[in-house]
Swiss-Prot record:
Family: Belongs to the RecR family.
Protein name: Recombination protein RecR
Family annotation (InterPro entries): DNA_Rcmb_RecR, Hlx-hairpin-Hlx_DNA-bd_motif, Rcmb_RecR, Rcmb_RecR_Znf, TOPRIM_dom, TOPRIM_RecR
Any one Gene Ontology molecular-function term assigned to this protein's record: DNA binding
Function: May play a role in DNA repair. It seems to be involved in an RecBC-independent recombinational process of DNA repair. It may act with RecF and RecO.
GO biological process: DNA recombination; DNA repair
Toprim domain location: 81-175
Gene field: recR
Source species: Halothermothrix orenii (strain H 168 / OCM 544 / DSM 9562)
Zinc finger (C4-type): 58-73
SMART domains: HhH1 (SM00278), TOPRIM (SM00493)
């Protein structure tokens, strides 16, 4: 016996495919969506379609954007001598929340993890190197404080230092094994201030 009408069962199934959404949460969300008026449902579904179709990656820094290059890369207000390397677009948001960082970004979309079979060629390092020839004086490595983040930071330092660019790593006021995106603004701000040369 089916507990739900087929369309609702399909909705619950699709919602439960999202990260962090289990069957019970998916069911709650489905019931919530069914209570919305039709225009709100259309608005919700259209916003998902728009986000998927209109969001792309910046060809310069790999961050999410609507236009290419992104607002960070094209802004004359940003410090173009400074690049902060992060693992994901969520980390860019975390850094921006501090209100302290005014440079550019480079998003790797991952970290080196030999255990998971992820090497340097599997993350977005290749387009970072040409950017360093454009007057960049410092690269701040802000990868997560875990084994993969450390491996990525060490690899980047070995790659960048011979080019004569200063390489620093954010200080570890962040919990070891934690994710940058979950750090509060004050902790992240202090970690940025206390960065050390690699």
């Amino acid at each position: 016996m089916r507990y739900y009408p087929q369309p609702m069962g399909k909705l619950i199934n699709q919602l439960s495919r999202l990260p962090g959404i289990g069957p019970k949460t998916a069911q709650r969300l489905a019931f919530y969506i069914l209570r919305l008026n039709p225009s709100e449902v259309r608005e919700l579904s259209q916003s998902m379609i728009d986000a998927r179709e209109k969001t792309k990656y910046c060809s310069v820094c790999n961050n999410l954007t609507e236009k290419d290059p992104c607002d960070f890369c094209s802004s004359p207000e940003r410090d173009h001598n400074l690049i902060c390397v992060v693992e994901s677009p969520k980390d860019v948001i975390a850094m921006e929340r501090t209100g302290e960082y005014k440079g550019l970004y480079h998003v790797l979309h991952g970290s080196i993890s030999p255990i998971d079979g992820i090497g340097p060629e599997d993350i977005k390092i290749r387009n970072l190197l040409p950017r360093l020839k454009e007057g960049v004086k410092e690269v701040i490595v802000a990868t997560d404080p875990n084994a993969e983040g450390d491996a990525t930071a060490m690899y980047l330092a070995r790659l960048i230092k011979p080019l004569g660019v200063k390489v620093t790593r954010i200080a570890h006021g962040l919990p070891v094994g934690g994710d940058l995106e979950y750090a509060d603004e004050v902790t992240l701000s202090k970690a940025l201030e206390g960065r050390r040369e690699m």
